[in-house]
């Protein structure tokens, strides 16, 4: 559950509560079951890095910094509070919250948001590795894979941190996939390049294969790329409307023949011209 619509749910207050915007827990369970009957898996978007700073939630829970750090790393760039992974009770809380969606609601996997902000202090490699976060994520994935080995566990991570998708038995963090943010940026940059300049930009289409086998990647054209004035995917492309339609078909063909799993934000395959508004996202 989350109080601020504009956060899209990423400023969480209730880690064990499905948002009431769509109904009650029984409604969500019915939704998952209906998806399964149609052969559709359900992957939850989980936020184990930071939480809403609201006074009626986890922040200063008992009058002290119980869940968050008591230092300059206690707050994120979004004004939220960062979880303190050096407290066992905090790690236990997050482990239990993640397990709830798999155990009670029978979801098929978990996508974990903003993992780069956990691996490094404040997401900044120059500040060093947050060893507490690494240990927490490794233990979380190990536990999830032991109890639900067929689940899909994915990291949104834009860093060069090694072994994010390596098994925990090989000292990896244990995710099944990580988002290939580099592929996404390079590909969209290439297709936004004027036609006459593209011969000098081919490296943007080939560079991803130079590092692709370092991790198990998922190619994502996500919600983050079609909001806040970034334009929809088709509107990012160079040319007239007819040329953009042809290029979009080419972009998707390239995406689906490129190694790696695939993810498209809802509506992108329908050639939406305008960005989804907050009210459409809620509806």
Residue positions per predicted region:
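Single conserved hydrophobic/aromatic residue that forms the stacking wall/gate
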Residues: 271-283
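Generic structural signal for residues positioned in beta-strands
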Residues: 14, 82, 178, 218-220, ...
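Catalytic Tyr-X3-Lys helix of short-chain dehydrogenase/reductase
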Residues: 32, 141, 277
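Glycine- and acidic
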Residues: 13-16, 234-237, 278
């Amino acid at each position: 559950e989350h109080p601020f619509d504009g956060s899209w749910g990423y400023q969480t207050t209730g880690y064990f509560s499905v948002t009431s915007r769509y109904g009650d827990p029984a409604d969500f369970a019915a939704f998952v079951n209906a998806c399964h009957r149609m052969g559709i898996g359900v992957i939850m978007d989980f936020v184990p890095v930071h939480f809403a700073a609201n006074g009626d939630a986890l922040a200063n829970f008992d009058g002290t910094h119980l869940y968050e750090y008591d230092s300059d790393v206690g707050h994120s760039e979004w004004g939220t509070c960062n979880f303190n992974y050096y407290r066992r009770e905090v790690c236990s809380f997050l482990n239990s919250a993640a397990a709830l969606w798999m155990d009670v609601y029978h979801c098929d996997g978990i996508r974990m948001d903003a993992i780069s902000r956990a691996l490094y202090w404040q997401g900044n490699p120059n500040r060093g590795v947050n060893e507490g976060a690494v240990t927490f994520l490794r233990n979380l994935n190990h536990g999830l894979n032991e109890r639900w080995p067929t689940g899909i566990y994915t990291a949104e991570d834009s860093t060069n941190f090694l072994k994010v998708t390596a098994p925990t038995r090989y000292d990896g963090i244990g995710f099944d996939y990580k988002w290939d943010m580099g592929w996404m940026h390079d590909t969209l940059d290439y297709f936004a390049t004027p036609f006459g300049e593209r011969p000098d930009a081919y490296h943007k289409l080939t560079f991803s294969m130079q590092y692709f086998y370092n991790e198990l990647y998922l190619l994502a054209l996500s919600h983050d790329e079609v909001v806040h004035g970034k334009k929809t995917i088709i509107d990012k492309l160079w040319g007239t409307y007819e040329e953009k339609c042809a290029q979009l078909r080419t972009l998707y063909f390239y995406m689906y023949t490129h190694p790696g799993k695939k993810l498209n934000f809802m509506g992108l395959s329908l050639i939406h011209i305008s960005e989804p508004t907050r009210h459409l996202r809620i509806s």
